[in-house]
A protein has these predicted regions:
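Membrane-interface helix starts
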Residues: 34-59, 238-241
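Hydrophobic alpha-helical transmembrane segments of integral membrane proteins
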Residues: 139-148, 237-257
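Short, membrane-interfacial amphipathic segments enriched in basic
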Residues: 1-41, 218-223
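Start (N-cap) of specific transmembrane helices in multi-pass transporter permeases
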Residues: 45, 136-157, 232, 236
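Hydrophobic alpha-helical transmembrane segments that constitute the membrane-spanning cores
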Residues: 60-63, 102-110, 143-172, 214, ...
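Membrane-interfacial helix-loop-helix connectors in multipass membrane proteins
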Residues: 71-94, 162-205, 209, 213-233, ...
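Short cytoplasmic-facing helical segments at TM-TM junctions of multi-pass membrane proteins
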Residues: 118-143, 226-229
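Loop-to-helix entry region at the N-terminal start of transmembrane alpha-helices
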Residues: 56, 60, 82-114, 148-157, ...
Length: 258
């Protein structure tokens, strides 16, 4: 009986959380005028959410590409198919690994920072002070961060992809001796803009919406204590990672299956 009660409580809690975050998203969309009328607010957040994440995304992409190049060359060589290494790495990064890994890195760095920042503003009653001054905190604080994250995520995924392909090139061509022309020509002949590049960007944009929405929602509704901010930041990273993987499965089934 206790098990059934526990499952029921968790199910109701999940439905309530889903409803809360949906209403919060609608509120952000309704209050987004300030983010576009005063673009300085969003541009500043693009710097904090996007530009400051470029280094970790680029370095991670480089090493992921190097690993893919090494593992791919080793396995493909067994079947005399090492020539398709460039295509294999590019397809893996553009369709799957680039958007997913870049989004998880974004969630763990910029997402957690957004939650902590908004949570600190709530703890120090800055959000309440905005309400007293007739300034809507969703329009002033949340919406610019939301749109900055949505805009930054596809760019970060693209940087991850470029760094990963270059990493595979370093390993496959410079180290293992694969012909440079074959590496690039296989990629050029088999990668398509719509099927590979555009679908990957759509994925990364969807991840950007999900991660940023979770981050600002957790910060805005956290318990206004230091422990509450810590728990909210942890929930942001964990929930974002699970949501990214769930959305990735749905989008992959829609985009890449007949």
């Amino acid at each position: 009986m206790n098990f059934i009660r526990s499952v029921g409580a968790k199910t109701l809690g999940f439905i309530q959380s889903l409803g809360s975050i949906t209403l919060f998203l609608l509120n952000i969309l309704a209050k987004s005028g300030t983010a576009f009328v005063r673009p300085r607010l969003s541009v500043r957040q693009v710097y904090f959410a996007g530009v400051l994440s470029v280094l970790i995304v680029a370095v991670s992409g480089l090493f992921v590409g190097m690993v893919l190049g090494l593992q791919g060359y080793t396995q493909l060589s067994k079947f005399k198919s090492a020539d398709i290494l460039g295509y294999m790495v590019a397809a893996s990064l553009l369709r799957e690994l680039g958007p997913v890994l870049a989004a998880i890195l974004f969630a763990s760095s910029a997402g957690g920072a957004m939650t902590s920042e908004i949570g600190l503003m709530k703890t120090t009653e800055q959000l309440e002070a905005m309400n007293v001054m007739a300034v809507n905190p969703v329009a002033r604080v949340v919406a610019p961060r939301f749109w900055a994250g949505v805009f930054s995520m596809p760019l970060l995924a693209s940087i991850f992809n470029v760094a990963g392909i270059y990493g595979a090139y370093l390993v496959g061509v410079t180290w293992l001796g694969l012909d440079s022309g074959i590496f690039w020509s296989q990629m050029q002949n088999n990668i398509t803009i719509h099927y590979d590049v555009i679908n990957g960007l759509i994925k990364s944009a969807a991840f950007g919406v999900a991660v940023t929405l979770i981050a600002v929602h957790q910060g805005f509704h956290c318990v206004p204590t230091s422990e509450g901010i810590l728990r909210a930041s942890t929930r942001t990273v964990v929930s974002s990672a699970l949501t990214i993987l769930a959305i990735d499965f749905v989008l992959t089934a829609w985009m890449f299956t007949d």
